[in-house]
């Protein structure tokens, strides 16, 4: 039987129905990789962050997320190189959609019950997204701004509904605005923590601060 079109599952009509002990035999999600590019790049290397944001309350299939991931990654690698960006898919498919298979051959009425017992069996996974929810994010250098915007624009053709591209005011994937990040980084109030930044407050034990700054223990000695 052919795959049912995604337009049949576009709207959020029912409650969330995740995989569980009473919802078994769920097929695997088509998207298995959510981070691509230079994932281990420090927070200082990629200051620019661009988001693809949903404008609708809808469901997006795992096949569409995988198609968008491949589309964006291929364009970014082709134009900027594989080490020039960090792409992250922010929507995760957890909602299970069902299908009540119907036979269309001769004598089908003898083999099936029609709309009686029509609950259906698990058929795939979709992500339930809200208005304003981020679907994909790219952090890169300021020189690659046009490339990242074009990559996310191409991803819009893989999704139903409407989306918009937003250039974030934050520094990369961190929670700090760009001006705030530069100021606090120069004063030593935040330190890099992978692709994020950690704020150093003035509270806490002395041992905790020494663990963050091992070189300070030599000054105490």
Swiss-Prot record:
There are 2 genes for uL16 in S.pombe. PANTHER family: 60S RIBOSOMAL PROTEIN L10. It comes from the Eukaryota. InterPro entries: Ribosomal_uL16, Ribosomal_uL16_CS_euk_arc, Ribosomal_uL16_dom, Ribosomal_uL16_euk_arch, Ribosomal_uL16_sf. Pfam families: Ribosomal_L16. Its main location: cytoplasm. It is found in: Cytoplasm. Component of the ribosome, a large ribonucleoprotein complex responsible for the synthesis of proteins in the cell. The small ribosomal subunit (SSU) binds messenger RNAs (mRNAs) and translates the encoded message by selecting cognate aminoacyl-transfer RNA (tRNA) molecules. The large subunit (LSU) contains the ribosomal catalytic site termed the peptidyl transferase center (PTC), which catalyzes the formation of peptide bonds, thereby polymerizing the amino acids delivered by tRNAs into a polypeptide chain. Belongs to the universal ribosomal protein uL16 family. This is Large ribosomal subunit protein uL16B. Component of the large ribosomal subunit (LSU). Mature yeast ribosomes consist of a small (40S) and a large (60S) subunit. The 40S small subunit contains 1 molecule of ribosomal RNA (18S rRNA) and at least 33 different proteins. The large 60S subunit contains 3 rRNA molecules (25S, 5.8S and 5S rRNA) and at least 46 different proteins. The lineage of its organism: Eukaryota, Fungi, Dikarya, Ascomycota, Taphrinomycotina. The keyword Ribosomal protein applies. The keyword Cell inner membrane does not apply. SUPFAM superfamilies: Ribosomal protein L16p/L10e. GO terms for biological process: cytoplasmic translation; ribosome biogenesis; translation. One of its GO terms (molecular function) is structural constituent of ribosome. It comes from Schizosaccharomyces pombe (strain 972 / ATCC 24843). GO terms for cellular component: cytosol; cytosolic large ribosomal subunit. Keywords: Cytoplasm, Ribonucleoprotein, Ribosomal protein.
